[in-house]
Amino acid sequence: MRNSYLIAIIVSVALGLIVLFLLFPTQPKSAIDKANSPTADSVKIQQAIELVNGPQPMQGIQMLLSMVEENPKNVEAHFVLGEFAIRSGQMEKAVARFNTIIELQPQNTLAYIYKGEALMQMDSVQAALATFNGAIATDSTSGIALVYAGKMNEKLENWNEAKALYSTILRHNEDPIVRDSVNAFIRKIDIKLKNK
């Protein structure tokens, strides 16, 4: 009697599992693989980066250029080309790449920041400030954008604006090292304002 009871339970559980699997279809293996694998573009971009950082930099750049030629909306390829332009001192090309990204993705805070960095290196303080303000408009808590905008305001001797930007960082960042650095910026500005 016990054996038949045990067999009935095992058969019931097995049937329950079979019904469960039949009622809830799973994704085909190829769909799961596709979701977990990087895109072909991402793989190609990674290969190009390795070439640029390795023995064949021009071949890597050519790969990236052909990618944006094939798909002008390939933000990732534009971004990498912009980064390489900054690294190689080609600031005008970098600005153009990041402008393209901003046109395609107006909320891309990082594109504004990189563009602003290129403009800073070109000594285009007003344009850099406007760009960092664009980054802040997309993410009002971006510490990098706030610091850079503060520094540009300092260069333009807009002390109160710089201080306000630095104070914003303090409202959004609890890191003691960051807070100490930002407070040092503010103290420096307070001295400038007192000596005015």
PLM features per residue range, with description:
Residues 80, 114, 148, 181-185:
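Canonical tetratricopeptide repeat
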Residues 70-73, 105-108, 139, 172-177:
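Short solvent-exposed coil/turn linkers within tandem alpha-helical repeat scaffolds
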Residues 1-43, 53, 66:
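Long, contiguous interaction/recruitment modules in multidomain scaffold/adaptor proteins
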Residues 137, 153-177, 187:
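TPR/TPR-like (Sel1-like) alpha-helical repeat modules
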Residues 61, 95, 129, 163, ...:
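Conserved positions within tetratricopeptide repeat
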Residues 49-52, 75-138:
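Alpha-helical adaptor scaffolds
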Residues 40-41, 75-76, 109-110, 143-144, ...:
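Helix-start (N-cap) detector for alpha-helical repeat units in TPR-like alpha-solenoids
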Residues 36-76, 80-90:
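Alpha-helical segment of the N-proximal tetratricopeptide repeat
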